């Protein structure tokens, strides 16, 4: 069923009172995060516990870039200071279309963790990848695994119509279509890059430590005979022994020794390789192919 609602505030109040899982869709600067906060603020004010899942791996408001983050909210005051995350899931890229499987699993995993932690309402703030095969594939599989009973599509013009049509053909879900939030500022690519760099800078805030690591601690497993120097500057997810991401790290190779630089080394059991190299002076990233890094192809 398709519902058109003109008032963002009216819909936020309705979802805050009635919904259990809401997924927000929209391109860049359409107001997904603004609406997510409206819903969370209204729900917590009414005494509900909200699990906010931010799946924007490029510019997350909860966790660092390259991660999906989840925050459990019980008070309206927490909505404005939504970081840091209560749980992270490392994806390892800034472009969800590059690693669709990892992105979908990360989102679904944190939706489930929010429910297990006692959330009455889960709000999923998705990425801005909404067009073409990559966008539709990403949103289709998120719907499959997260199973929201309400979807909100924010759009300028009619760019969301293909995804809306697809969801209505394949899923029994109520879709609300709203125009883009008029008060949301449109950010330039340079502004987004600066926000991304600041998010990574916070993820590598002091105190940082160097931890020597063995080649056996990685996922995916390193091939036999790999020149470990090829891993230098790769971004990694630091994981405990329970499948949870503790934060980010950066691999450093020097004098035949491989180390990870991180501020979350306590409890570290394994490292997940990302698909980015990180410059710790500028906090700029460069995408890489793990297949090329490990196999030269």
Which functions belong to the PLM regions below?
Residues 28:
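The conserved Walker
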Residues 1-17, 24, 42, 149-297:
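Preference for solvent-exposed, low-hydrophobicity sequence contexts
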Residues 113-173:
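Phosphate/Mg2+-binding loops and adjacent switch elements
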Residues 32:
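Conserved lysine of the Walker
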Residues 35, 39:
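Hydrophobic positions on the alpha1 helix immediately C-terminal to the Walker A/P-loop
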Residues 41, 57-61, 140-142:
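A generic local secondary-structure boundary/capping motif
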Residues 2-25, 46-47, 51-122, 130:
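Nucleotide-state-sensitive switch-loop elements of NTP-binding domains
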């Amino acid at each position: 069923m398709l519902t058109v609602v003109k008032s963002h505030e009216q819909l936020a109040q309705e979802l805050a009172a009635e919904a259990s899982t809401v997924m927000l869709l929209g391109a860049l600067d359409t107001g997904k995060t603004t609406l997510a906060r409206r819903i969370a603020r209204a729900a917590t004010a009414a005494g509900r516990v909200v699990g906010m899942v931010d799946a924007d791996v490029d510019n997350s408001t909860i966790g660092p870039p390259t991660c999906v983050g989840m925050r459990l909210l019980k008070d309206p005051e927490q909505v404005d200071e939504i970081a840091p995350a209560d749980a992270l899931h490392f994806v390892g890229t800034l472009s969800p279309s590059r690693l669709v499987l990892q992105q979908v699993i990360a989102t679904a995993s944190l939706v489930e963790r929010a429910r297990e932690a006692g959330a009455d309402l889960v709000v999923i703030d998705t990425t801005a990848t909404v067009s073409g095969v990559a966008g539709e594939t990403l949103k289709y599989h998120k719907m499959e695994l997260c199973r929201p009973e309400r979807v909100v599509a924010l759009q300028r013009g009619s760019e969301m119509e293909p995804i809306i049509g697809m969801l209505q053909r394949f899923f029994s879900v109520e879709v609300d279509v709203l125009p883009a939030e008029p008060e949301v500022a449109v950010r330039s690519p340079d502004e987004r890059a600066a926000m991304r760099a600041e998010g990574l800078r916070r993820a590598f805030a002091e105190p940082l430590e160097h931890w020597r690591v063995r080649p056996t601690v990685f996922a995916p497993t390193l091939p036999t005979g790999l020149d470990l120097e090829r891993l230098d500057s790769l971004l990694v997810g630091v994981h405990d022994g329970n499948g949870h991401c503790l934060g980010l790290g950066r691999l450093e190779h020097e004098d035949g020794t491989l180390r990870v630089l991180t501020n979350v080394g306590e409890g570290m059991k394994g490292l997940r390789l990302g698909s980015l190299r990180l410059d710790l002076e500028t906090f700029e990233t460069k995408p890489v192919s793990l297949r090329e890094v490990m196999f030269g192809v």
